[in-house]
Design a protein with these regions (language model features):
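Residues forming the flavin
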Residues: 1-53, 57-270
């Protein structure tokens, strides 16, 4: 794979203009360009009123070795693709299904990866599913009546669901986790430009659908969700979690992905 950086085009421009610029930068014929993927897009406004987009693009071409041998300048380089790899499985048999506490970003992605690997996770969420949660949030804005467990902080999708779905990217993530997260969001309905724009965000309306589709995929893979299920105690000797003060759920392995607002759960764990 070849990476081309500092590719500047005026705004607006077409896809065809970007491809022509790539071909010129690489000194190849159009038919030698097999495919390309935008990795980064940033705005250059230093020469106002002129505005430019500056791109970093990963390219597949014919005769890559020959091109790299004769390349000129530092804006064309060779890179190795590093897709995210799930850590190796353990050697001991898992006692029961894994239980995940919380269905914010950490909990959802934990459940998604475990479900893909065949572990059929159970997700416990103190709030409501994202559809009911949206209704509760709308009701709060209209009436001022707060549902303490289903609001902008608690419920499926986590606190970011109602903050426009802004994303922070880990530029130096060598394990490909950041790319995996963004590609997963795109898979479930987010706009493809979150993969490369400088300040990506999904948008609350779209994120609600993305979260719902992630849940549906986890369910399809054998996972389970239990909403309005607050973990109220950790019963270590019994290998159980107490839910809503009464119910006991077996949990040989439990992942607490409770975000920053579940202060009562922090106190219970302490």
């Amino acid at each position: 794979m070849i990476r081309v950086s500092q590719l500047k085009l005026s705004i607006p421009h077409t896809k065809e203009q970007l491809e022509k610029k790539l071909v010129r930068q690489l000194h190849i014929r159009p038919e030698e360009l097999i495919s390309y993927q935008i990795r980064r897009q940033s705005l250059d406004a230093r020469k106002k009123p002129e505005l430019f987009y500056v791109y970093t693009v990963d390219v597949k071409v014919k005769n890559e070795a020959m091109l790299l041998k004769h390349k000129k300048g530092s804006n064309v380089s060779h890179i190795e693709e590093r897709p995210y790899q799930v850590p190796p499985h353990g050697t001991e048999k898992l006692n029961g299904r894994p239980v995940i506490v919380g269905s914010g970003p950490a909990g959802l992605f934990c459940a998604y990866v475990l479900a893909k690997e065949g572990y059929r996770p159970l997700v416990l969420e103190r709030g409501a599913d994202v559809e009911k949660r949206k209704s509760d949030v709308d009701h709060f804005w209209e009436t001022g009546v707060l549902n303490p467990d289903s609001n902008v902080q608690f419920g499926e999708g986590g606190a970011g669901t109602f903050s426009d779905g802004k994303l922070n990217t880990l530029v130096k993530d060598k394990n490909g986790r950041n790319r995996f997260v963004l590609e997963t969001f795109v898979k479930f309905g987010a706009a493809e430009d979150i993969l490369y724009v400088q300040k990506p965000h999904i948008g609350t309306d779209i994120l609600i659908e993305v979260v719902r589709k992630m849940r549906e995929e986890i369910l399809r893979l054998g996972g389970e969700f239990s909403f309005h299920s607050q973990v109220t105690d950790l019963l270590v000797e019994q290998h159980c979690l107490q839910v809503n003060g009464t119910e006991e759920i077996p949990a040989g392995v439990a992942v607490f992905a409770i975000g920053h607002s579940a202060r009562d759960t922090f106190e219970m764990l302490n």
